Amino acid sequence: MFSGKYLVDLSLKPRLKSGVNYSLIKENLSDTAVIYVGNGVRGLKVRTDSLASDISGLPSLQLFLSTLQALKGHTSLATISEQINCSHEFISEVICQLLHHQLIDMHGSTLKFNNRIIEHYSSNQNLSSDDKSDGASQSLMARIKPELEITTWYENSLDGGVEKVYSRIDFPILIVGLSRIAIATAAILQASGFQSIQISSRAPEENPDKPITFEDISGGYIRPSDCGIGKQRVVSDMNAQISLFPISKDYSSNRTIPSSIQRFKPRLVISIGWPSADKFQEWMSSDISFLIVEEFINRSISIGPLVQPGKSACINCVHLAREERDPFLNHVVELRRFLPEREVPAAVSSFIAGLISLDVIAFADLGQSAFSNVQKIFSLDSLDSPQNFHWGLHPECQCHAV
């Protein structure tokens, strides 16, 4: 499996990705020893006969095992080579194979956090003694680690996924709607690293800072003590309470405050409920992507499409396509949007908020969405197999010219 010559910077201090383990195993019906490196989903098998003996005279399988044991993120490859007495070529071959199977991180990342620089390598081993005693640093390190379980497995992620999580600071999101789903989604996104989150009402006549009531309590962020407090204020207070990257109140200047917060312009809108014609037109003309979450009715809820103006099907494209397929059904669906807004059960609120948040993370990190040109209807009777409706740019719609 290991062959050819590789060039690797031996000053690097790589480490195996989170969740990657290794084990020496004997294959059935043979005495061939195998080292497996991986996590059960992806992995690498190395047999005794797949590695040429190294210059040290030790079996190459043992050298491979020794190399794996040394990949902890704080020892350079050159030092590892000296410690286990193997050639630079051997070390390079091992690293390149681990890179090929995306099982290794090659370097750490630097986070600029509340006027401080924090070195991070998906563990707190890199922290200085001062940082380790800093409560804010400890909190950040403890809370960012679970978030990296998503980003470290992105293709070509070499820093444990830290930079992807950190870049969410500059991805402002507007949530339209004041429902349980809206509040739960805002809380999850704040805890996932999105620093700039705002909510607004769906209708102009609705108070955007509508007070919290007992109906809003659904097992998430909202507590009985929040009743009577405006919903916009509650979402704003989330930054200090649960945000992964809270904004310090001690900023001496706006230089360290992300531009997305100094002047709020959303890069994505999440519309909980069908948007008004005015809001739809505003987002289209401003080239702002938006995701639609429809009403919960008959034990079902619809998510999508995620509209990227001029690039994917808009809600008018969907309307025109529905009109062609079934005018009567299209009329019924349109009328349903004029019904009074109703709250969803607590379990549905948490499920939908989590589902939306995972898709928003993928969209912010990678520019990908499971709801682009797609509407998914989730029924409580078959959550494992939602109905999928695929839409495309309609030839009679003018959104292509946006």
Model-derived features with residue positions:
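Adenine nucleotide-associated cytosolic modules
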Residues: 1-402
